[in-house]
Structures are given as C-alpha cells and as structure tokens.
C-alpha cells in the first residue's frame, strides 16, 4: 500500500465527481458536505454504502483517519475522505485527544454533555488556572482505491469554558471558545464556524493540494 507522508507536497489531484465520506457521524457529514458543496462533487456517506465503522486501533489522528479512508475506498471502489478529530486540553496533558469520542460513550450511545461535564470536573479537581487552554485538531485523509492517500492537518486554538453554551454544533463544540471570539462553536453560526474551525483549516489545505 502506497501511503503518503505529511512532510512532502501532495502530488495527486482529485479529478473525479464522486466521493465517499468515511464517517457515520451526522455532524461531521453535514460539515464536510457543506465544505465540498462548491466543487460540484456527489457526496455519499459510509452508511449510504452499508459500511460498518472499522475499528480504530491507532493512537494518532493520522493513523485512525487512514484506517477509515482506506477501508471505505477499498470497499466502494471510490475515493474516500475521512476525518479524525478531537479536542486536546492543555491542563489534562492533551486529553481526551484521539479518545474524544470514547469519552462520550455510554451503553445507550454517545453522551457529549456527560463528556463535557467530565472534562470540566477533572479541570476543577486539578484547580487548573484560567483560561483553560485547549485546541481542536483535525486530520483529513483522502484515499484512493489503489492505496494512495494524501494527508492534511488543521487546528483551532482556544479554551474550554463552563457552562457549555449553544446548540448549533456537535460534540464538544458548546464548551470550546475559539481564541479571540466571544461565542463558542456551539453558539456560532455554522458559516462563521466554517471559516475558522480545525476541520476548515485542514480542508483549505486539502483544496490547495488536491482540488486547486
């Protein structure tokens, strides 16, 4: 399998008109589909193809994004775009990180209000000083059925705040306040969020590398 490395310029352009989004996360699907809309690409999800979620066995965003993208590309015979992302909190030594979604897992599905409460409780127990700096990190992997891929990383700096605010985002968005802003990602208009999010940062690099 020919996997690219992030320290070299992308060399393969995307020249198709169909793309699989290798995710079952409805929030991510909406956000990525909106970012891809200007390119006239027909987008389908992993669920549209009846794909199960592959086991994410890596301990990095890049590793897990590659697992998802290559699984979808090989299963469908179409190029596939995956995202692996999470929030890292400085005072928690970078947790939850790649385990961001795992922190929300319950027997009845993911409970992000519970996960956000857990993060804040841990910070309170440590008497972490304010502002409680954090960052959202995103890695996008565009994979082709022949095993080639391109990797793009994005980041949004900010802090976590309490109480969580807003219902426009998903995941940890309601407790993440981007640097220099007064609204959390959960309060922010989606178009405004798309201008500054970690995923948008990675997406701009993807567009420059593979679509421009």
State the predicted function of each range:
Residues 12-20, 26-212:
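Anionic-ligand binding patches
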Residues 4-6:
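Cysteine-centered motifs
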